[in-house]
């Protein structure tokens, strides 16, 4: 048997793919795949929905903004400045029209940002402003999104998808329990606010916890039952026979 070999010459050339690795995805628009390069990203914390009163002849103000220890915020703006190097004016014009066409008609949808692996935002595109620099052959777009103030985790608590784990802010905890007798379980919400929790059930299980006396859940009614999962550690008592899964998604002020 005879083999033929191809000579591999040594080289010191560094090869790079001229494809952006940072960007955002909204609707069917992926800034990386189109070829837009992110220059800057701005996501300041949102303004609080304040209720304050000033009383004559008293110092300071009375702040009634909080309820049950929780602060409430308005939407937040997330702004991207992205650039597209193109020497031909006609091509720059095409990309300007296309980014507006792709982003502005879309209603409230998920905004995925490579800067925040493990999270997504929910909102809509507020504006797209474009600057065309003929001298530099550079198209610059400033894209503003109007979003819910908190970011959502990509997956439900307990899914622990390895690629979405944020090790600096994460706990590993079971959320599904096999119930054969009365048992106490503890779940922790390490997010930034209380969140709604749903259930998935087999058999018949009764759950009691903070803020409610008890729900008797079956496969037929579990999808209609919800509770609020407060911040911190929460103790629940489960009884009956079957399995019960707590299904909630953290919301983070990041």
Named regions from a protein language model:
Residues 17-21, 103-108, 201-204:
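A short, compositionally biased
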């Amino acid at each position: 048997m005879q083999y033929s070999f191809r000579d591999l010459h040594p080289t010191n050339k560094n090869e790079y793919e001229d494809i952006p690795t940072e960007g955002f995805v909204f609707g069917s628009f992926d800034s990386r795949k189109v070829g837009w390069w992110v220059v800057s990203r701005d996501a300041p914390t949102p303004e609080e929905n304040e209720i304050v009163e000033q009383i004559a002849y008293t110092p300071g103000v009375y702040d009634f903004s909080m309820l049950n220890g929780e602060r409430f915020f308005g939407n937040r703006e997330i702004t991207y400045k992205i650039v597209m190097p193109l020497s031909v004016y006609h091509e720059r014009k095409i990309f300007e029209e296309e980014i507006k066409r792709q982003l502005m008609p879309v209603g409230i949808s998920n905004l995925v940002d490579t800067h925040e692996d493990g999270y997504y935002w929910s909102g809509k595109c507020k504006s797209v402003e474009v600057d065309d620099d003929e001298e530099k052959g550079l198209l610059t777009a400033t894209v503003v999104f109007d979003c819910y103030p908190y970011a959502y985790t990509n997956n439900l608590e307990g899914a622990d998808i390895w690629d979405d784990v944020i090790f600096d802010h994460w706990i590993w905890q079971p959320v599904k329990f096999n119930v054969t007798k009365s048992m106490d379980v503890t779940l922790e919400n390490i997010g930034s606010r209380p969140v709604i929790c749903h259930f998935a059930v087999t058999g018949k299980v009764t759950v009691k916890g903070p803020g409610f006396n008890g729900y008797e859940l079956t496969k037929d009614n579990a999808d209609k039952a919800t509770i609020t999962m407060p911040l911190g550690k929460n103790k629940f008592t489960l009884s009956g026979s079957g399995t019960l899964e707590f299904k909630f998604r953290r919301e983070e002020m990041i």
